[in-house]
Structure formats: C-alpha cells, structure tokens
Amino acid sequence: MSAPPAIRFGVYLPQVASSFAEIRDRVLACEAAGIDSVWFMDHLHPPGLPAVPSFEAWTLVCALAPLTSRIRLGHLVLSNSFRHPALLAKMASSLDVISGGRLDLGLGSGSYEPEHRMYGIAYESSAVRARKLAEGLDVVKRLFTEPEVTFDGEFYRLQKAVNVPKPAQKPNPPIWVGGAGGPTLRLAARFADGWNCPTYALGKLDAKLRALAAECEAVGRRPAELRKSIEAVLVTGRDEREVAAARALAERRYPGPGWGLHEGGFIGTPDEIVTRIRELAARGVDTFVFFFSDRARPETIDLFARHVLAGFR
C-alpha cells in the first residue's frame, strides 16, 4: 500500500486594497516560514467591493516569481472566460519555466456575472460555461504535452498549434479544478490533477468527496489519484482571548455563509486547528489553503508556522 500524500499548506492572499510591496512582503514571509504555496484570486474587479486597488492575477504572479525561490504560485481559480485556453497554456508554460517549475494552475468556469457585464465579457449559462471549461481544459492539457495540436470544438478551434517551451513540470503543472457542482466534479475527474473544495461547500465536504469518487470511477480513474484541497478562513491565536478577537475580525471581514467560517471552518487555538486538519486529512484532504483573518500579518504567519505547520513537518 502506498503511503498517504504529504499534507501541504497554502495561504490565500486576495490582492485587494494592498500595495504591491505589502503583497510581496507577505509572500516572502510565507516562503521564509516554510509554507508551501500562495494563491490569488482572478477578478478584474473584486466582487462586491467599491473601486479599491486590485492587481490582475497573472501580472501579479509573474512579478512575484523572480522574487521568490521555493514557494509555489497559483490562483484559486482562474476564470476560463477571461483568456483563450491556447493563450493560457502559453502563459502557464512560460511562467512554469521562468519560476523553475513552481506553478499550480487552478481553473474554473467563471462565476461572477456583474464583473463580466462590467468589462463586456460574455457570460453564458452555467451549462455553456461548463462545456467551454471542458474544452478549455482539454486544449490546455494537450498544448502542455503534445508537439502539435489541432482541435475542432464547439467553442475553440486550433490548427497545428505549437507550444514551446513546454512546462518545466512533467507532464504538466498540477491542474486544479475548483467548484462543487456536479459538472465541475465531472471535469475534475476527467482532466484535473487536483480538486479544490471552495469555502461555500465545506459543510458538504463528505458528500462532495463521495460524488467526486463516483465521477472518478465512472471514467476509470482511482479516486486516490486526484489530490484534494480545501480553502477556508482560519481563525487562531495563542489563547482563547486572542482567538475571540481574531474571530470578531473574521466575522466582519468574511461575513455570511459563503465563506465557510461556520460550515466546517477552522476556528480555535493552534492545537485545535491541528486536530481539525488531521480529521480532514484522514478523509482524504491533502492540501489546506487558508485565508487568515488578518490577511496574513507576519505575527500570524509566524504563529501558524511554529504551532501548526511544525506539527506536520
């Protein structure tokens, strides 16, 4: 029997209302602390917020790649509607080479209709977006691995397209599909190296894992081949008083059920967080991507590294 996959930890750093220097410093602090990855959003305008500064997703990670040396870089998740998949494959291959093989490629169908309207980008029905994502994933994977690609799909067409250089990671950078609906789970089983459970589905994680396993088996794939990650708000402190203060901040910053703060989230002292991680790891989750309630201030990263991360190294 093969050993269970190592548990990996990432930090989600929404690039909103922060200067580039602030984002850079927090990424470097995460790298110094031994955190495995940092993840960013892909929005042209932050959902539900006024006109606050935010950095475009790819521009940001390309700027961070040469400033870092070990930490992995990714997005949860890129919107398939923002970029043609052939262009995305070229961008991803280039960044994977530039970063020395440190890219994780998260891809989804695009979910925020007002943003699409704002920028004049077509926003089709969920069924159409799912079919487009399926074709997009197929195109990206083939351009990562094949010398020449001709593709004649419903939405995308390629004629003897080449993609050189190929990604540094072989056969491709890890591809993550994020979302919790049936069509998304089906696409993860068909195309992805990993599935990401979003915050809003944490309370239904067991049901989603069972559904994902069924989709894997339907395409002749062992469910254990697919990595599983969750993203969640993490609320912690050195003692109960600090936890209460951090929770109050998180309640203001991440209100409502969509953030998963109460639906299976992570609230407690470091020992309680470790216990919760071990519970989910036993159910098959191998990657944990956390939103810190204070947006990953250095002292919080240090606390997490010394009292949570250290328990898994």
Functional labels for PLM-detected ranges:
Residues M1-R313:
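Active-site-adjacent structural elements that line small-molecule/cofactor binding pockets in enzymes
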